Amino acid sequence: RSAWTGQQRFGTVLWSGDIEASWETLRKQIAAGLHFSASGLPFWTVDIGAFFVKNGNLWFWKGHYDAGTEDLGYRELFVRWYQWASFRYSAGMEQTAEENFGILKIQKSLFMMFLYK
């Protein structure tokens, strides 16, 4: 989540940290990745899809999709996030257990839906 001057020589992998699911957050993640790369830190990754529900007091659990994977808006955001992240050398998904179950449940049909349109 953090870096310092000279870290480039160690070839470390950086991650943007826990984030909320919103189009604004995705936009900021793209800019953050460009900034990291421009500063000589190309090994940077992101959590695909982010946290989509308002579930607790943690600052990153402020997603805009309380219906989760049933929300067509979140499905669109998730696919666009995945498309962008596929150009990264490394990317993963980090959600709560409740969110992961929903994503795994719809992931195949979601990708097939967008793949053949």
Model-predicted regions and their roles:
Residues 1-117:
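Catalytic-domain carbohydrate-binding cleft regions of carbohydrate-active enzymes
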